[in-house]
Amino acid sequence: MEQGDKQATYNELETEQPVSKEGADSQPEDEAIGAASEHADAQAGENPEAASTTADPAEQTSVEAEELAKAKAQVAELEEKLAEMEKRYLRLYADFENFRRRARQEMEAAEKYRAQSLASDLLPVLDNFERALKIETENEQAKSILQGVEMVYRSLLDALRKEGVEVIEAVGKPFDPHLHQAVMQTDEGGYEPNTVVEELQKGYKLKDRILRPAMVKVSQ
C-alpha cells in the first residue's frame, strides 16, 4: 500500500508543467517598465508646470513674452528715475557753482574795497584840509602853520592813493552823471554845452567804485 502511494506522488510530479525560461526573464522587465511609468507619473504630479510646459509650447511662449514685457517696463522705469536724478544733480551742481562764484566775488570785492569805509569817513577831513589851505594870509606864523597843514594833507592823500582812492577829474570834462553832481548851470562862454566849468566840491572814487561824486557847475 505504501509503495503504491509513492508511485502516485512521483507520477504527479512528472505531470506538472515546467516554467519556461522566457516567462521567467520577462517578469522583471515588466516590473521595471511599470516602476518607470509610476515614477514619471509621480514627477508630473509634483511638477505640473513642467509637464504642462512640455505639453504646451504656445503657453510657454506666452509666459516668456509676459516676463520680457515686465522686464522692459522695469528697465524703462529705472531709466526714467535715472534721468530725473541726473537733472536734479545738474541743478544742484549749477546752484553750487553759482554759490561758489558769488562767494568768490564777495571775497574779491571785500579785499578790493576794504578801505571804502575808512576812506568815506575821511572825505570830510579832506574837505576841511582843502578849505584851510585856501586861506590867504601874510602872517609868517600862519603861513608856517598852513605849510604844516598841507604836508599832513598830502600825506593823507598819498595813504589813500595806496588803497586805490583817486580824485575824480571834473573841470573841463564833459558832464557825467555817474561822476558829477550838477548843482548849478551857467551861460559862461568858452565852454562846450554840458561841460563842467567849475568844481565846488571834490569827488572821490575807490578804484572803479564811486565814493562821492564831484559837485560841479555845468555850462548850458
From Swiss-Prot:
Q: Name one GO cellular component term.
A: cytoplasm
Where do the segments described as Disordered lie? 1-67
**Tagged with keyword Coiled coil:** no
Provide this UniProt record's keywords sorted from A to Z.
Chaperone, Cytoplasm, Stress response
InterPro entries per the record?
A: GrpE, GrpE_coiled_coil, GrpE_head
GO molecular function list: adenyl-nucleotide exchange factor activity; protein homodimerization activity; protein-folding chaperone binding; unfolded protein binding
Q: Where in the cell is it found?
A: Cytoplasm
The protein's superkingdom reads: Bacteria
Q: Name one GO biological process term.
A: protein folding
Look up keyword Signal and say if it applies: no
Disulfides per UniProt? none
| Bias (Polar residues) | 1-12, 50-63
Q: What does this protein do?
A: Participates actively in the response to hyperosmotic and heat shock by preventing the aggregation of stress-denatured proteins, in association with DnaK and GrpE. It is the nucleotide exchange factor for DnaK and may function as a thermosensor. Unfolded proteins bind initially to DnaJ; upon interaction with the DnaJ-bound protein, DnaK hydrolyzes its bound ATP, resulting in the formation of a stable complex. GrpE releases ADP from DnaK; ATP binding to DnaK triggers the release of the substrate protein, thus completing the reaction cycle.
| Matches recorded under HAMAP family | GrpE
Question: What binding partners and quaternary form does the record give?
Answer: Homodimer.
Give the protein family. Belongs to the GrpE family.
Q: What is this protein called?
A: Protein GrpE
Q: Which organism is it from?
A: Geobacillus thermodenitrificans (strain NG80-2)
Organism phylogeny: Bacteria, Bacillati, Bacillota, Bacilli, Bacillales
Corresponding gene? grpE
